Curated annotation (Swiss-Prot):
Protein family membership: Belongs to the thymidylate synthase family. Archaeal-type ThyA subfamily.
Keywords noted in UniProt: Cytoplasm, Methyltransferase, Nucleotide biosynthesis, Transferase
Compartments reported by the entry: Cytoplasm
Xref: NCBIfam families: thy_syn_methano
Function according to Swiss-Prot or TrEMBL: May catalyze the biosynthesis of dTMP using an unknown cosubstrate.
Gene label: thyA
Species this protein is from: Methanothermobacter thermautotrophicus (strain ATCC 29096 / DSM 1053 / JCM 10044 / NBRC 100330 / Delta H) (Methanobacterium thermoautotrophicum)
One matching Pfam family: Thymidylat_synt
Catalytic EC class: transferase
CDD domains hit by this protein: TS_Pyrimidine_HMase
Entry protein name: Putative thymidylate synthase
InterPro entries membership: Thymidate_synth/dCMP_Mease, Thymidate_synth/dCMP_Mease_dom, Thymidate_synth/dCMP_Mease_sf, Thymidylate_synthase_arc
Quaternary state and interactors: Monomer.
Length: 222
């Protein structure tokens, strides 16, 4: 059974997921032998992915994102901004893959531009979907994308974004991934001329690594 929640902001969703996994997660060892605690099929809908408050951390692009960062969290500032920008860049920057490269260059088609084109042509389109998984390459590799799919829908003048992760490091990666997704959604919404709506993140395997158990326990005490 899926664990589904609605939250106002990205940081709220991250904290609730950390709490859920530390309380109810089942211990699982992954392919590399790392011990994790895991909850299957978590679905988090973020109602205000761009944030609102003046004292939130600011990321400047074409517009201003006001996204709250968990206090003391290691993803913040310039590091978080640069990571978010990778969602829009087709350059792999020396990595085996990046999400931006898979979305914009890897398959020989710019899926992001095509999604925007479809939404401009038909605001009710159900075809503005992008994928990262490359079966011929990824079935033979140990370094494969965790985010598999991103989908955009325009409803009631707002852009609703849904993304699927096959595997999600909740303590170490969920928050920056969600910020990167918000960055991506903000770009698409601006190109199409609509407001950013809810973002929904479905994590098939939502887990926390043993190396982060202590930090995660501290989050629960907040």
């Amino acid at each position: 059974m899926a664990y589904s929640i609605e939250v106002n902001e990205i940081a709220d969703g991250w904290k609730k997921l950390v709490e859920k996994i530390m309380h109810d997660g089942r211990e699982i060892r992954d392919e590399r032998g790392s011990l994790t605690r895991e909850v299957m099929n978590t679905v988090v809908t973020i109602k205000k992915p761009l944030g609102k408050s003046d004292d939130f951390y600011h990321i400047r692009r074409g517009s201003l994102l006001n996204i709250k960062v968990p206090e003391g969290y290691f993803w913040s500032g310039e590091k978080l901004e640069k990571y978010s920008e990778q969602f829009l860049s087709g350059d792999r920057k020396g990595f085996v893959y990046t999400y931006g490269n898979r979305l914009r260059a890897h398959f020989g088609v710019d899926q992001l531009d095509e999604a925007i084109r479809r939404l401009k042509n038909c605001t009710e389109s159900r075809r503005a979907t992008m994928v990262t998984w490359d079966p011929p390459e990824d079935t033979a590799s140990d370094e494969v994308p965790c985010m598999i799919l991103v989908d955009f829908k325009i409803r009631d003048g707002r852009l609703f974004t849904t993304a699927l992760w096959r595997s999600h490091d909740i303590y170490g990666a969920w928050f920056p991934n969600a910020v990167g997704l918000a960055y991506l959604a903000d770009h698409v919404a601006a190109e199409v001329g609509v407001e950013v709506g809810h973002i929904t993140i479905h994590s098939i395997s939502a887990h926390i690594y043993e190396v982060n158990f202590k930090e995660a326990e501290e989050v629960i005490k907040w």
